[in-house]
Amino acid sequence: MADRYWVGGAGTWDATTTTNWSATSGGAGGASAPTSADNVIFNTLSNATAYAVTVGTNANAQDITIAGPAVGNVTITSGATAVINCYGSWTSAATGVVFTTTSGAIINFLATTTGKTITTNNVTLGAMAVILSGVGGEWSLGSAFTITANFTVTSGTFTTTASNYALNALRLLSSSVNVRSISFNASIITVSGPTAVDFTTTTNLTFNAGTSTLIGTNSSSTLAGGAQTFYNVTFAATVSGTTTIIGANTFNVLTQAAISAAGLRFVLLSANQTIATLTLSSGASAVTRTFVVSNTIGT
């Protein structure tokens, strides 16, 4: 294992380019490109002023630490084919770091040991999809985490921790047969995509909702819960549309917000649900109604 420090300002981070890598902080460039065993560090000696790093395909690292230059920001630019493979922990600073991301970019978290953290200090990673897939890996949030792409747990253990950090993503996905565990503690989980949650295949999944609140904001939210137990779930869209719940799930509190203008809101159920408290809101007039329906005619 070695440390690789970014130097020289603007450049490309991929599996082969060596121009901007140094074996020492603020040292000469030309060191070997980081591998899965090497720690990657961006710091105040990476450049004196603002600069941009373009992420290519298979930018590899063990731990990744990103801080800004002495003046201005480092902008991490990830196009649609950009891939970062992180085999350890991720830490990016609250200031001095900006992520510019195109849909299609991916961060793979590939650790196979426990004790890894993901800390972005409330700075959004944008449209960077996140996939946790290291067999035996464990990742804990070290701050609130926001992306506008999918957050996927394929293998390993993910927790928002007892600090109850918020998670914001387009979709929350974990539909596979791999051994995996998800714990939400008392966090607020907000998903904005039409498929809010997809736990369709729950083989080898351990899901602990804790006392969390899951919020779906899309006008056509689908929760494919895989017959799991959730705590508080709110479908927050206030426009016409259909909320779909798939699987025989269990809820502590299930809430459907009222629509705010003329139209209809349908709550479509594919199976029996077990709900301790159900709150169905509708508008103040006959043209703003909420209907609960089955996806099977006659039931």
Descriptions of predicted regions:
Residues 1-299:
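Extracellular beta-sheet-rich ligand-binding/adhesion modules
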